[in-house]
Structure formats: C-alpha cells, structure tokens
Amino acid sequence: DHTALDLIIKSLKSPTMVCEGTHFDGKIPHTFVIFGASGDLAKKKIYPKLWWFYRDDLLPKLTKFCGYARSMLTVDSIKEQCLPYMKVQSHEQKKYEEFWALNEYVSGRYDGRTGFELLNQQLELMENKNKANRIFYLALPPSVFEEVTVNIKQICMSVCGWNRVIIEKPFGRDDASSQALSDHLAALFHEDQLYRIDHYLGKEMVQNLMTIRFGNKILSSTWNRENIASVLITFKEPFGTQGRGGYFDEFGIIRDVMQNHLLQILSLVAMEKPVSCHPDDIRDEKVKVLKSIETLTLKDMVLGQYLGNPQGTTDDARTGYVEDPTVSDDSNTPTYALGVLKINNERWQGVPFILRCGKRLNERKAEVRIQYQDVPGDIFEGNTKRNELVIRVQPGEALYFKMMTKSPGITFDIEETELDLTYEHRYKDSYLPDAYERLILDVFCGSQMHFVRSDQLREAWRIFTPILHQIEREHIRPITYQYGSRGPKEADRMCEENNFKYSGSYKWHGGKAATSNL
C-alpha cells in the first residue's frame, strides 16, 4: 500500500542516502516553527505549502505547526489572512479545519529571551514532551537574524530530536557581511542543520539540468568550448517593485537576482560531473566552478533603470522607478543588469556566460540558452543559423533544441525548427510542485542538494563584491530604458560582442510561452 508520502520520498533521495544522513522520520513528532508568521512570505507561500502537504498526506503524521511574530495575532487571524492563497476546495473543508487545529501562535519580541521561552514552552506542550524534530523557518528581515538564531540555539532547540534552520536570502550585502553571517551561524549550528533557501534551486527545469547534462551522451560530449559559442541565462519580469521599492532600492537587481538565482543556475550548467548524486558531491563541484570564475568588472556589465512609458494605458505603466514613492528621487539603483562572466578552466576557457536580469521588461521569462558554434564549411550560402539548446524555467517549463532542416516542398530551402519537449504537452497529467514545495519537503527529508552551502556563498560574493562596491562608491548612473521594452540597447550590443548571435527571425511555437523576443 504505497502512500503519496512513499512516492515523494523515493523522488527526493536515493536508497543509499538513508545511511548517508538523509532521513524521513515518519513516526516521530515534527514541529514546524514559522518566524515572521505575520508577514507576506508566510501567508502567501509558507502556510499554503504546509496546508497542501497536509492535504496530500506528504508530511510525517505527527507534524504540528507554530507561528511566531511580534504582532498580537491569533491562529484564527492568520487563517483569515492566508485564505486567499490556500486554494481550498469545498470537499476539503473538513481536512482544512483539521490542519488549522494543529496550529498554534506565540507573540513575542525577537531581541529578548522572554518570547522565546514562551515559544519553547508552547512547543513542549504541543510535543507532549516526547522526542521531536524541529524545523525553524526564518521568514524574517536580515536585521534580526543574529538575535533570533542565538535565541533559537539557547532556548528552543529540541533536546532529543534533530533541529534544522531554514534561512531566506539575502545572505549579506557583500563578502564581508555574508562572511560575518556565516561565521555567526557556524558558531551556533552545524552546516548540516542549515538550509539556506534559494527558491530557484527548487524549480523543475533547474533541477532537471543535471539530468539533461549528465544523462545524455549527445549533450555531454558537446558541452565544452569546442562546440559552445556562448551561454545566455535570462531572468525577465514585466512588473516593477510592487510595494518592495524600499527593500529593492537598498539591494538592487544584482543582489536580488544575479548574484544568487542566476549564478546558481550557471554553476549547474558549467560544473563538472559529480562523483555521485549525494548533495555534498554536487555542491563540491559547484564550488569548484565558482572558484574558476574571474571577478566581474564594469567593462563587462550594462546597468539599466526603467522609465515610465508616457503612452502607457495605466498609471503603473507610466510610472518610472524613481517615481515610486518608496524610492529616492536620485536613486542610482539598477533595475536591469547584464554581466559577462568568464570561467578560467579547460572546459570553458573563452566561452562567455552572459547573465541578464531586469524588471519592467517586455515579458516574464527565465531560461538558459546554450548557443552552439557556427557550422564550419557552410555550404548553404550563409542561410544557416546557430543551433541552440533552450531550457525554459518559467513560464511553461520546456526544453527545446533549435536546428536547421529542409523546408517541406519542392524547393531546397532551409529553415529553423525545433525538437520540442514542452512539459504542458508531454506531461499533461503530471503535477509539477512549485519551488517552495520541493524545498520544504527536502528539509523534512534532510536533503541539502538544492540548498546553498557557506563556501558557495563565499565564492559568489567574491565574484560580485568589487563591482557592487564600485557602483556605490562612484555613484554610477544606470542607462535608462522604457517600461515594456527589452532593456537597454547597449545590452544587445554587449551580447553581440560576446559571441551571442540574435537574428530575431525565429519564433518558438512550444506552448503558451511562445515568443520571438529574447
């Protein structure tokens, strides 16, 4: 009698990982503690995911939940705040009430012992003083990380079971602040207790990168500088800061997206084959390739900031970044960045890795585009286009390979077409869990494969800290671009200068995400 839980466990780990430290203790009580339970992340992401796990019987049977925040709330008020995001069907109402009956809430400060002592008393009461495992999710601003983690360590740790701490980015602002945070956490917890969450590592196609690379001879044998001309990793959003202007203006697009999400994807694309699928073997290879990346310089970057479109049909479309009331009028914070990274190793020497991200662009899209070299000895009068392997992360997961074929008919014309694996078509009846679902389940199972280790962080900040400090020190003005555009034209020129060819002649037809825009 296989339950959904059995199936998810099989998908999360190999059988050998039980003896390598990855466990799913189905019969032991688990308590999931949400710090910042009154915040947006909790109501929009964390509580909905926990409800879906409970609904689908994916959690250990003796799991309970406890929220903690400064706000004077009750479980009923949190339940009301979360309702729009919970997706409860009418026939699930009974089970939904059962889920909330397993919840408690404690109000307290983050900078004192009293609230945490009350929290620990509540946890012991919920666990009936039995052996229990505890997961602490810090959905909190970084300003309170240190106080909260000290109080967790001193007051709230399970004595008999294991303890795991989930931490949200940002993991510092630069190499010094990130290292200070890592040193602080290392003094309190073992690395195997820390789960630094980068939700992009939980996305279906990002997790598929290893299989695509190392499970297919046709790709693995061409995955090198002899065959690949350039790699373009893109993250585009059609919307702006949406109420996060204050936070975003402090951190900017490089810290918010490029230094973490895009660099993590790059490490999966560029790393060497690990000796096994054990989490630490994979993370070891990620660190090795990050160590081979040269520090980013200003000559390899384009920075942009969006303007409102005077012809926009809504107030939002007509509003530029600095017109956001939460943003300084003279802000130099980039909302668009393109950076060219160079990997100094045998496999990738001379292949540009172009990272591109921006807000208020022409579409929502995240993808990896592997562009192959031109065909040598062209016999088709220059009509061939480069082959491309495109891994679409969102929206609409897909994998397609652009190639040249003869056009149907009596002529001998050639055209671009694709070998297409669009998940929407190939896996019609499959449910693709979202990133937070996968990653929270990984924490229950103890799999750190898709979480960021401290040495990965150190190398990531080494690459980006000098350019971030230079931008701030020299008050470098970003190039302006209009709402709804593809971004600064200078970015297209830099792509071209770095051996990425874009003809604009091809339109992918694979599903709803079809577009001719790069």
From Swiss-Prot:
It comes from the Eukaryota. InterPro entries: G6P_DH (IPR001282), G6P_DH_AS (IPR019796), G6P_DH_C (IPR022675), G6P_DH_NAD-bd (IPR022674), NAD(P)-bd_dom_sf (IPR036291). NADP(+) 2 binds at residues 356, 365, 369, 392, 400-402, 420-422, 486, 502, 508. Gene3D superfamilies: Dihydrodipicolinate Reductase, domain 2, NAD(P)-binding Rossmann-like Domain. It is an enzyme of class 1 (oxidoreductase). Pathway: Carbohydrate degradation; pentose phosphate pathway; D-ribulose 5-phosphate from D-glucose 6-phosphate (oxidative stage): step 1/3. One of its GO terms (molecular function) is NADP binding. Its EC number is 1.1.1.49. GO terms for cellular component: cytosol. One of its GO terms (biological process) is pentose-phosphate shunt, oxidative branch. The keyword Oxidoreductase applies. NADP(+) 1 binds at residues 36-43, 70, 169. Its main location: cytoplasm. Keywords: Carbohydrate metabolism, Cytoplasm, Glucose metabolism, NADP, Oxidoreductase. D-glucose 6-phosphate binds at residues 169, 199-203, 237, 256, 359, 364, 394. It is found in: Cytoplasm, Cytosol. It catalyses: D-glucose 6-phosphate + NADP(+) = 6-phospho-D-glucono-1,5-lactone + NADPH + H(+). The active site is at 261 (proton acceptor). The keyword DNA-binding does not apply. Cytosolic glucose-6-phosphate dehydrogenase that catalyzes the first and rate-limiting step of the oxidative branch within the pentose phosphate pathway/shunt, an alternative route to glycolysis for the dissimilation of carbohydrates and a major source of reducing power and metabolic intermediates for fatty acid and nucleic acid biosynthetic processes. Belongs to the glucose-6-phosphate dehydrogenase family. This is Glucose-6-phosphate 1-dehydrogenase. It comes from Drosophila yakuba (Fruit fly). The gene is Zw.
